[in-house]
Design a protein with these regions (language model features):
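Catalytic-site neighborhoods of secreted/periplasmic enzymes
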Residues: 1-97, 137, 228-229
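Active-site-proximal cap/lid insertion segments
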Residues: 63-230
């Protein structure tokens, strides 16, 4: 997609769309969703959109944002960090219970345990790995001694850069050296948490009767053409 198109993707999914979750729900599956949805317009974070599209338990679904901390409150889930009274991407004080990747994984595990012995479909949409390149301890320093590769394209002139990347602010090799070890930490944290889900399925005797799909909406440029993210 061109940058002009990608910047306008806060669309609402049409009411007439039948998702695979709705098909499974009609067949008697227990369905649930936690994490980023990004299919209900501009709401941010907008917890538990009213239009569920088959995801019966969508309490922990939020529409937009790459939040780093979450918390459970008396009125439902909330972003765990605020600035000037508004949710922000901070992670001060984040731990294995409040950091977004861990918190969302706990919701998956709770659902899997509750539906043990039943047919279910649960989708978790982790914000990470994604900018801002920050992650909780100990992952924040786990790869600080790693020297990330510096793409040759980072030093090219704007005239040598593809049009979709040429207008955006550029990062330097020094920035890549600082931020990519954090990115590796985000990936490791995600890997460990997916391992927790698999361990739960094994413990419950569900691992051989569960289809597991691991996918992503985009990769990361990792400094190519002076860009991070997509």
């Amino acid at each position: 997609l061109g940058a002009d198109v990608a910047s306008a993707l806060n669309y609402k999914l049409g009411d007439d769309i039948v998702t695979f979750a709705e098909v499974l729900r009609r067949k008697g599956y227990a369905t649930g969703y936690a994490g980023k949805w990004h299919l209900d317009g501009d709401g941010k974070p907008q917890w538990g959109p009213k239009r569920k599209f088959g995801w019966e338990d969508n309490r922990f679904m939020f529409n937009r944002g790459h939040w780093k901390m979450f918390a459970d409150g008396p009125n439902g889930p909330r972003v765990g960090s605020t600035k000037n009274g508004r949710p922000d991407y901070g992670l001060k004080g984040a731990d294995e219970k409040s950091f977004a990747t861990d918190w969302l994984t706990d919701k998956v595990i709770n659902f899997v345990n509750e539906k043990k012995g039943k047919s279910f479909c649960y989708m978790v949409s982790y914000p990470d790995p994604h900018g801002p390149n920050t992650v909780r301890a100990p992952y924040d320093t786990m790869y600080e001694d790693v020297k990330p590769p510096i793409p040759r394209s980072v030093n090219k002139t704007r005239a040598q850069t593809p049009k979709w990347a040429a207008k955006a602010p550029r990062i330097t090799a020094d920035t890549i050296r600082i931020l990519m070890p954090k990115y590796y930490g985000m990936v490791k944290c995600l890997d460990d948490n997916i391992g927790r889900i698999l361990d739960t399925l094994r413990k419950n005797g569900q691992i051989d009767n569960t289809i597991i799909v691991f996918t992503s909406d985009h990769g990361d440029l990792c400094g190519e053409h002076g860009r991070l993210n997509k």
